[in-house]
Amino acid sequence: NIQECLKGADILMVVVPAIAHRFIAQTCAPYLKEHQIVVLNPGRTGGALEFFNALKQHGLRRFPFIAEAQTFLYASRALGPAHAKIFSIKNTVPLATLPAYWIPGVLKVINRAFPQFIPGDNIFKTSFENIGAVFHPALTILNAGWIEETHGDFEYYIQGTSDSVAQILEKLDKERLEIAAALGIKVMSAKAWLYTAYSATGKDLREAINANPGYSGIKAPDRLHHRYVDEDVPMSLVPLASLGKMLKVETPTINAIIHLASVMRGIDFWEKGRTVEKLGIKGMSIKEIRLLAVTGEL
């Protein structure tokens, strides 16, 4: 009973695949109160904006505090019903709110339980620093044969990131950085993120991945019908590519991964994904998008 769950709650930690964010927003909308804090763990790309739009479409005029985490705090795996293994806890995870001026107040409350959360500049920065967009879809698709043959019986990050695969990840990462730069937002490279989140260093991305003890022992997905594709393609790569197209930033590598994922899964991820139309920012200028992040007003 969602009404009973929300009654008396001050903080709502939403820990579901991003494909469920809109459903959660629609389900909770009739019962949410202004004082409550909703944290998407994580938002992926555009999570807070999609959640806000879903509440607005439901008729809300007074909103709870909506926040999104840049990534999930834990490097973990579900091992069975009510059974999970935490491989590592990240050093820090940026968190941003819509609008951005809520960040200090929300963090003051959240940090009492989770000191790892730190201020993110705004929801577009946390969305662009969604490193799952870089690692998950491409790494899964490029290791599809190995995953299907072994049912994921290999170390996903350590063994899955060969020299050639790492080159593709770095190119995809470069396109992500270029889209952010077009909006005037400076974001970390995937290699820099590995150092910030896990203190892992290396001369290139592959070396940094191999140097991360938090990835040691993490197995690959046992099938391709997995959130690394079904969540991260439509909720991470599609919004990046869609925004890139609007800003006239070329994204051939991102587009290629979206296309391959769509063919492989028999799903039109462009249709299912978070496009600029669905996020309510189609046709907006760079100034208007940046103002939206600060004020929360469309």
Q: Language-model segments: which ranges?
A:
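Residues that form or immediately flank small-molecule/cofactor binding pockets and catalytic motifs
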Residues: Q3, T71, A100
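Rossmann-like NAD(P)(H) cofactor-binding subdomain of soluble oxidoreductases
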Residues: A18-G80
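Internal alpha-helical scaffold of NAD(P)-dependent oxidoreductase catalytic cores
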Residues: G80-E155, Q159-W193
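Structural motif
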Residues: D10-I11, I37
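A generic structural signal for well-ordered alpha-helical segments enriched in polar/charged residues
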Residues: P30, Q57, R112, E178-A182, ...
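NAD(P)-dependent Rossmann-like dehydrogenase/reductase catalytic/cofactor-binding core
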Residues: A166-L298
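Short, well-ordered coil/turn residues at beta-beta hairpins
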Residues: G8, V15-P17, N41, A113
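A structured beta-alpha segment of the ubiquitous adenosine-cofactor-binding alpha/beta core
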Residues: N1-A9
